């Protein structure tokens, strides 16, 4: 699993409420979360398919 996929999910401080996906290293699956629009890390993908291609 690439290092960016092991980063914790990070919503960020903004309040844009953008649907995104991240790799949950505990469950081994890509899961949805609501991204605030700024201040995230590299464990953030536009689609579940992109997340799975990169991490799962």
From Swiss-Prot:
InterPro entries named in the record: Kunitz_BPTI, Kunitz_BPTI_sf, Prtase_inh_Kunz-CS, TFPI/VKTCI-like
Gene Ontology terms, MF aspect: serine-type endopeptidase inhibitor activity
Cystine pairings recorded for this chain: 5-55, 14-38, 30-51
Residue ranges occupied by any BPTI/Kunitz inhibitor domain in the UniProt entry: 5-55
One Pfam family matching this protein: Kunitz_BPTI
Species of the source: Anthopleura fuscoviridis (Sea anemone)
A single cellular component GO annotation: nematocyst
Site (described: Reactive bond for trypsin): 15-16
Note: Does not inhibit potassium channels (Kv), as well as metalloproteases, and cysteine proteases (papain and bromelain).
Family: Belongs to the venom Kunitz-type family. Sea anemone type 2 potassium channel toxin subfamily.
Annotated tissue distribution: Expressed by acrorhagi.
PROSITE patterns: BPTI_KUNITZ_1, BPTI_KUNITZ_2
Protein name: PI-actitoxin-Afv2b
